[in-house]
Design a protein with these regions (language model features):
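Histidine- and acidic-residue-rich, metal-dependent catalytic cores
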Residues: 3-4, 9-171
């Protein structure tokens, strides 16, 4: 099976002209939340950089522009769960094992920050937020998904986030 998800079901979403304005408004809201996430996590432009890379990867994979835009929006707020965690925990230089486990809860905590997402796009955003720490070999969290069990958006964010992290200075 394909690493990039030929075997994975793509979002069954048709983006119409009427949806374009809604997508623009969604992008603006996601950019606002992304900036807030970056402020809380002390990662300057992380959301912007990850989402732009996800968009470029989506287009390179031949996804429809509307789906690429949805992926961009979802990637902007994939770490929304950090908004529910204490900033001292997020910015600690060292973490105890217990604190590491608490940090991992950001994937489940994201859900409460996605209430503005239109229902028809919900699954993409939920997959982005809750599954971006899953690994192809099953060693990720929170569910230990592997291979084709991991949605395409989560794979794209995993790759983009890793690249951005490796190529950026932490503030």
């Amino acid at each position: 099976s394909s690493t990039w998800g030929a075997a994975v079901a793509l979002p069954d979403i048709e983006i119409t002209e009427e949806d374009e304005e809604e997508l623009k408004q969604l992008a603006v809201k996601c950019e606002e939340i992304g900036a807030e996430i970056d402020s809380v996590t002390n990662r300057k432009n992380n959301s912007k950089n990850v989402s732009e890379l996800v968009y470029k990867l989506s287009m390179q994979l031949g996804l429809a522009p509307g789906i690429a835009m949805l992926n961009f929006c979802a990637a902007m707020i994939y770490d929304a769960g950090f908004l529910a965690l204490d900033s001292e925990l997020i910015n600690a230089t060292t973490l105890t094992d217990e604190q590491k486990q608490e940090m991992k809860t950001h994937v489940e905590l994201a859900e409460k920050h996605l209430d503005f997402v239109p229902k028809k796009y919900w699954n993409i955003f939920e997959d982005a937020a809750m599954k971006h720490h899953e690994n192809m070999d099953g060693t990720g969290y929170p569910k230990g998904l592997k291979g084709d069990e991991i949605p395409q958006i989560a794979r794209l964010i995993r790759v983009a986030e890793s690249y951005v992290s490796l190529s950026s200075k932490r503030n």
